């Protein structure tokens, strides 16, 4: 089979710049839809519907479904789908730039109601997209995403493990995180070079470790994990003196992965009350989020 044919599925050639890998394994699709468990009357939104592998079985169970699709050709296919077109609201935009709050608030959600978000996310944008969606956690009921297995491990990690990092902390700050199922490369066309997994993220009704300004939680975790091999005495030296860390009950010889979310929230709230005179925000290193 030619490389071009291996990238073609249902007449559409996967586009590398959009990170497209199309799900086609019916058992996997069934298990994902069962995990989502869509119900009529719920507000459901799919990010990156692609060729409709999840869209079709979800739409079979509900009357309305909103999808966000950047690829013009795929959006056009969905508009002319024989049984989906009358059920779909198609938002042809980049999900990373889309104002989800404005859209969610336009739905006039009832008290205690939230949007249910799902998708087989392009792996090249999955982490920044989740960070984008966390901003709207108060309007979301749950999220089910297909991601790289390695990313799911990071999302679900506990302190004192190599997988534990900034992504772990930010995800678990906003959400309860649960792995759902693992998916082999053969379930996709073209097959990715990595294993995949589905994760469920359920935003907390009440944040367990609230911070006064999430900027400072981002700030302190970025600095700590950018230098994760250093002790916190050294890694956070531009933000805290050793005496200040000790007063906050932080072990000076601990490393970034040893602190809990509660510890980082305590540090963030102290920084909010005592911001450094000069704040040189460190660049976020992708491998540490």
Curated annotation (Swiss-Prot):
SMART domains: rADc (SM00650). Its EC number is 2.1.1.182. InterPro entries: KsgA/Erm, rRNA_Ade_diMease-like_C, rRNA_Ade_Mease_Trfase_CS, rRNA_Ade_methylase_Trfase_N, rRNA_adenine_dimethylase, SAM-dependent_MTases_sf. Keywords: Cytoplasm, Methyltransferase, RNA-binding, rRNA processing, S-adenosyl-L-methionine, Transferase. It comes from the Bacteria. The keyword Hydrolase does not apply. It is found in: Cytoplasm. S-adenosyl-L-methionine binds at residues 21, 23, 48, 69, 94, 120. The keyword Iron-sulfur does not apply. GO terms for cellular component: cytosol. Specifically dimethylates two adjacent adenosines (A1518 and A1519) in the loop of a conserved hairpin near the 3'-end of 16S rRNA in the 30S particle. May play a critical role in biogenesis of 30S subunits. Belongs to the class I-like SAM-binding methyltransferase superfamily. rRNA adenine N(6)-methyltransferase family. RsmA subfamily. This is Ribosomal RNA small subunit methyltransferase A. The gene is rsmA.
């Amino acid at each position: 089979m030619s490389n071009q044919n291996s990238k073609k599925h249902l007449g559409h050639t996967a586009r590398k710049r959009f990170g497209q890998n199309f799900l086609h394994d019916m058992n996997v699709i069934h298990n994902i839809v069962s995990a989502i468990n869509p119900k009529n009357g719920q507000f459901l939104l799919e990010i990156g519907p692609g060729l409709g592998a999840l869209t079709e079985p979800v739409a079979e169970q509900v009357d309305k479904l909103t999808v966000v699709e950047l690829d013009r050709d795929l959006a056009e296919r969905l508009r002319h789908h024989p049984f989906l077109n009358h059920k779909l609201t198609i938002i042809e935009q980049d999900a990373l730039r889309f104002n989800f709050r404005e859209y969610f608030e336009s739905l006039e959600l009832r008290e205690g109601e939230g949007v249910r978000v799902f998708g087989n996310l392009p792996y090249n944008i999955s982490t920044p997209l989740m960070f984008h969606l966390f901003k709207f956690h108060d309007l979301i009921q749950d999220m089910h995403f297909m991601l790289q297995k390695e990313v799911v491990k990071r999302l679900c990690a506990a302190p004192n493990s190599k997988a534990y990092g900034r992504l772990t902390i930010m995800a678990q700050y906003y959400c309860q995180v649960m792995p759902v199922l693992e998916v082999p490369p053969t379930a996709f066309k073209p097959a990715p070079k990595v294993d995949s997994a589905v994760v469920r993220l359920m935003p907390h009704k009440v944040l367990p470790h609230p911070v006064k300004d999430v900027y400072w939680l981002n700030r302190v975790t970025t600095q700590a994990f950018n230098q994760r091999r250093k002790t916190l005495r050294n890694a956070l030296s531009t933000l805290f003196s050793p005496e200040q860390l000790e007063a906050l009950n932080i072990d000076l010889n601990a490393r970034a992965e040893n602190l809990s979310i509660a510890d980082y929230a305590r540090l963030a709230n102290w920084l909010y009350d005592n911001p450094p005179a000069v704040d040189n925000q460190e660049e976020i290193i992708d491998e540490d989020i």
